[in-house]
Amino acid sequence: PERDGDYLVDGVINLREGAQVTVVAVMTDADRTRWLVGAPDQDRYLLCEPVRGHGLSGEPPRHILHADQDYALERRGQSSAAGVGMHGRPALPRVATYVYRAGPDQTLWLERWGDQVLMGAATSVSAHDVHFLPGS
């Protein structure tokens, strides 16, 4: 996904898996939507571009072919979910998350809300490259 932009946060989902909290910020810059995924104590974020029309529903497979790349499941988890704002996710209390990799900087982030699957093609960005304005 394109990294540069002045994004406005439309909504936020806090995902809690045990003691680990992951934040998904749904952001827009003009007509571009991106998801910024990460934990406050990590030094890297995933910057995801939503993938439409992927055809997945229910439990995702162990391998996903996307943009001529074979992505293998690296990690999955179950989290409680609490959202605010216009995040575009179903109003469900739990979500399953999946991380797939095809290379060092070729990542897919998936969220499964019941049978609905959301997919983002992601690149890793340094937390030092992400800046939040005061009051955000």
Which sequence ranges carry the predicted segments?
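Mixed-charge, low-complexity intrinsically disordered regions
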Residues: P1-S136
